[in-house]
């Protein structure tokens, strides 16, 4: 596939995904009548529904590989009628609601109606089930690592399962935005969505970029211009414990390694410009000409002599 066609393909997929994320950004669980809705698919994965504060519609964000026609909608609260599908009031379920349309209207006790809209994108799906913790707990400290979490990645008919360590990452992107970036780590080098195998992978939220294309365009341009060590990323829809978090970029963690930044010099090092947290690192310095702090993130040979040499070379 040529570069132009490849770029066009993911741009169309991303456009649809961006619409879903824009809807999600405006949503929150509604209070009041205690109505909630969710689905449980064939793999027993739960997908929570969200109520948009803009239009009052409840949205379900479903993986690309889930059949809308076979989706079983569950709900809390008393539902007396549905505009489509087979309603089971006793068990609080609605079967076949989205067989002909992506929208269904439910009538609640008292005559109030709620509209539910099911949405999907064509992006790969990445689902995490946390073990012994919650997303709220993870958000309290980005540095705490939580092992033993179940990961499922689906891309069309391809399904990958594994166990990963999960943690937060980032500096200003972690502090300033509700949509957080994360890191996952496998126990051994693992390929994700066809990218070169590695243990550590990052999930970029792109919270400050509503278009969600700036990062990808920069890396695609760098690759086409022949720059070495260009980070590879792919778009995914991310769920954690059934909560849809939006569109993320999963990609290689910037680190020294054969399939990453392949440095051979013992004093070969990777520094990060970091005016917010550099002084929290073990090794950092201030560059007066740039009026910026730089932190040593990684070095080939981690001993005092090579660290001193690397910082001097910089």
Task: Identify the residue ranges that each predicted region occupies.
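N-terminal module-boundary/linker segments of secreted carbohydrate-active enzymes
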Residues: 100-104, 111-156
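Internal "kinase-insert"/substrate-recognition segments embedded within catalytic cores
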Residues: 190-191, 205, 227-229, 244-314
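Gram-positive cell-envelope targeting signals
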Residues: 1-32
């Amino acid at each position: 596939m040529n570069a132009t066609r490849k770029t066009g393909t993911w741009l169309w997929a991303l456009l649809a995904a961006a619409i879903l994320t824009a809807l999600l950004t405006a949503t929150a669980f509604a209070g009041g009548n205690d109505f909630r809705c969710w689905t449980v698919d064939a793999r027993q994965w739960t997908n929570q529904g969200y109520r948009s504060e803009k239009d009052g519609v409840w949205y379900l964000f479903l993986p690309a590989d889930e059949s809308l026609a076979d989706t079983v909608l569950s709900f809390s609260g008393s539902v007396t009628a549905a505009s489509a599908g087979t309603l089971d009031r006793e068990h609080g379920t609605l079967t076949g609601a989205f067989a002909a349309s992506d929208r269904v209207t439910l009538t609640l006790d008292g005559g109030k109606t709620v509209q539910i809209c099911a949405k999907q994108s064509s992006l790969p799906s990445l689902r995490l089930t946390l073990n012994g913790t919650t997303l709220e707990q993870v958000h309290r400290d980005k540095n705490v690592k939580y092992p033993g979490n179940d990961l499922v990645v689906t891309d069309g008919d391809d399904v990958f399962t594994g166990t990963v360590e999960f943690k937060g990452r980032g500096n200003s992107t972690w502090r300033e935005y509700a949509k957080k970036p994360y890191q996952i780590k496998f126990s051994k080098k693992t390929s994700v969505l066809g990218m070169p195998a590695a243990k550590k992978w990052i999930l970029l939220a792109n919270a400050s970029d509503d278009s969600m294309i700036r990062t990808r365009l920069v890396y695609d341009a760098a690759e086409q211009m022949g720059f070495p060590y260009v980070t590879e990323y792919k778009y995914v829809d991310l769920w954690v414990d059934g909560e849809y978090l939006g569109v993320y970029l999963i990609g290689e963690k910037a680190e020294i390694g054969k399939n990453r930044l392949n440095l051979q010099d013992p004093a070969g090092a990777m520094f990060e410009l970091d005016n917010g947290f550099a002084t929290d690192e073990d090794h950092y310095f201030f560059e007066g000409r740039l009026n910026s702090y730089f932190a040593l993130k990684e070095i080939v040979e981690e001993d005092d002599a090579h660290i001193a040499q690397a910082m001097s070379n910089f």
